């Protein structure tokens, strides 16, 4: 795997609905064996105390817009091959809250950079159960960003 100190090929600036502190950056780095996806998210809803950290569904969606407040314009999960959830091309591991922040790095071979340009990245309010069809019962969309070439 290449070092991601190189510039990403694509990025998505994540924002919550107006007035929400949710923000972040998702970056996409081409690799020999797939795409390295990194996420740095801030302002997630969180609770303090033991066993209280939240888990959030995190996916690439097929739509090309992030219209607040519900981000329904992002469409459904991005899926190149007609697979069922959790095998959609856009199904990614969840984000784990740490005091309102989350960081993620994952290598995937489910898509190439050209496949996702103009698509959206969505953060959901609940964890993905990786079973319920068609989208994992991850709840409302609380953050969204459009993937653009960098």
Residue ranges and their predicted role:
Residues 1-150:
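N-terminal leader/targeting pre-sequences
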């Amino acid at each position: 795997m290449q070092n991601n100190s190189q510039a990403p090929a694509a990025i998505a600036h994540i924002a919550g609905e107006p007035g929400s502190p949710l923000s972040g950056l998702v970056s996409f780095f081409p690799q020999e064996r797939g795409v390295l996806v990194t996420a740095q998210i801030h302002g997630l809803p969180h609770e303090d105390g033991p066993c209280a950290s939240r888990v959030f569904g995190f996916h690439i969606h097929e739509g090309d817009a992030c219209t607040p407040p519900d981000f329904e314009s992002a469409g459904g999960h991005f899926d190149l091959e007609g697979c069922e959830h959790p095998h959609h091309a856009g199904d990614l591991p969840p984000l784990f809250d740490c005091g309102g922040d989350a960081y993620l790095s994952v290598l995937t071979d489910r898509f190439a950079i050209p496949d996702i340009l103009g698509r959206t990245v969505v953060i959901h309010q609940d964890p993905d159960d990786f079973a319920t069809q068609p989208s994992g019962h991850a709840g409302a969309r609380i953050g969204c960003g459009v993937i653009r070439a960098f």
